[in-house]
Amino acid sequence: MKNQKTSLRRQPQQQRSQKRVEQILDAAAIIFDQVSFEAATTHTIASQAKTAVGSLYQFFPDKLAIFNALELRHVERVRIMWDKLFRPEIIQLPFVNFIHTLVTQVEELFEQPTSRIVFRQF
């Protein structure tokens, strides 16, 4: 995720560190979705990610920084969705088909915990 650099305390250099950051973000999205941002703790996020809480703190100073990284992930997914929808072959569909395609894409986006929790917080 290219915008992630702005939300990380330390930039992961190795592939396994990048994978750990993704695991932390995936776990945080699940935990925030299940219990809410307010009720979530960095310890439960680390446990869900199957990593030590110290590893989490290497990359994120607190759960707000994790949430901010999830916001960036969501924004990138929305951008990708719009790029798909505004291809000429989609725009030229009959209106009903275009709306169906749009609704389907938005449903798929919000099936992901990241998008649900970002939306709920606002």
Give residue spans per PLM region.
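Hydrophobic alpha-helical connector segments
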Residues: 69, 84-111
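Short, Lys/Arg-rich amphipathic alpha-helical interaction segments
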Residues: 88, 121-122
